[in-house]
């Protein structure tokens, strides 16, 4: 085993990387509330894992979506547990994100030189809300259908561009297969990719600038 480690150490300098990670200075004022961002990340990772597991059974069509969710909950091995964990971690992610935003704001973590860290955090907040909207529609039940119909219908009040914007969101004039396909693609590919990119930017900035000091 030591020879394998030495082989990687010689080429990648693993020990230097580990020392840099473990020796990072942590200010003495840091408390449990500074863990809220990390908990949000953990919830996101749980979402990715459980969501990926459900893609093996979920069918993104208006005729089969609801039945496939029923199959996950009643027949697939541990499907009920995987979907329940997905829902619980989604709620937890939103709650932890909100508390994290309050903590950062109340401790002045958005001030110079951390403005860009705050901006990436705001983008992550928008992406998290988008996860909720798109995911809500996927079971294709009554609640999801009417929620999507209302949310996508909001831009219609905008003069001139309102109706085209609604059609862009829905993929057609009404909520149907095109809407479900778009929301499924957003929920399972586009939003996770964007979230991963902005999380990486967010953490690299924190890593570079360190944790903000006390007020």
UniProtKB/Swiss-Prot annotation:
Binding site for heme c: 35
Cited Gene3D superfamilies: Cytochrome Bc1 Complex, Chain C (1.20.810.10)
Role description: Component of the cytochrome b6-f complex, which mediates electron transfer between photosystem II (PSII) and photosystem I (PSI), cyclic electron flow around PSI, and state transitions.
Additional record remark: Heme 1 (or BH or b566) is high-potential and absorbs at about 566 nm, and heme 2 (or BL or b562) is low-potential and absorbs at about 562 nm.
Membrane-spanning residues: 32-52, 90-110, 116-136, 186-206
InterPro entries, per the entry: Cyt_b/b6_N, Cyt_B6_PetB, Cytb/b6-like_sf, Cytochrome_b_N_euk/bac, Di-haem_cyt_TM
Residues annotated for heme b 2 binding in this entry: 86, 187
Assembly description: The 4 large subunits of the cytochrome b6-f complex are cytochrome b6, subunit IV (17 kDa polypeptide, PetD), cytochrome f and the Rieske protein, while the 4 small subunits are PetG, PetL, PetM and PetN. The complex functions as a dimer.
Bilayer disposition of the protein: Multi-pass membrane protein
Pfam family, one: Cytochrome_B
Single GO BP term: respiratory electron transport chain
Keyword annotations: Chloroplast, Electron transport, Heme, Iron, Membrane, Metal-binding, Photosynthesis, Plastid, Thylakoid, Transmembrane, Transmembrane helix, Transport
PROSITE patterns: CYTB_NTER
Principal place of residence: plastid
Compartments where found: Plastid, Chloroplast thylakoid membrane
Gene Ontology CC: chloroplast thylakoid membrane; membrane
Species of origin: Gossypium hirsutum (Upland cotton)
Residues given in the record as heme b 1 binding sites: 100, 202
Cofactor note: Binds 2 heme b groups non-covalently with two histidine residues as axial ligands. Binds one heme group covalently by a single cysteine link with no axial amino acid ligand. This heme was named heme ci.
Name assigned to this protein: Cytochrome b6
Listed HAMAP family: Cytb6_f_cytb6
Cofactor(s) needed by this chain: heme b; heme c
GO molecular function, one term: metal ion binding
Family statement: Belongs to the cytochrome b family. PetB subfamily.
